[in-house]
């Protein structure tokens, strides 16, 4: 997948959403550092030109700046990725600065923060109230000032996305945040149409579920009627020559 995408995109984010769309977890909270490293290694084997960023999962960086550095440095050393991403509440500013000062490129994440879904009230758009909108803007500015090279803006209104983009001097990458951001990102299985239900902000650019379903149906039918394997799929015995 990474090899196919590589020539068409500037950046590949190995996001902790893989816990839900690949491993079937109910949220990103159960994703481990080992899972992120495994998937990061796989992406790095396929990607040759895109900037590869790997998420630090829940519980791997919040306890202290030192914990964050240990996790981030391990991810970078074991995967070979170029940067890490952390969700950026007010608590994260000092952590971002600490990491950047020690050579870890950091992408931040504001707005809807899936790792904090239990305290934010679930997966829903953020910033519809003035107080929360102001908090999102402040978090983005703080993350930029702390040294983040880019910020993901998720699940906010067009107005908030525009304010964030205008307020920071780093690229804003939107997901459910309108075209007011400098760039866009989507969860690949969502974008490829692997699931019936996707968030409102997703556009399905393919219908992989239908293609896969039809392929499996055809395969099963041909196995049952013995039309597969056919002549083109067989190896022929060749008697040894004396």
Q: Model-found features: residue ranges?
A:
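Alpha/beta enzyme core
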Residues: 1-240
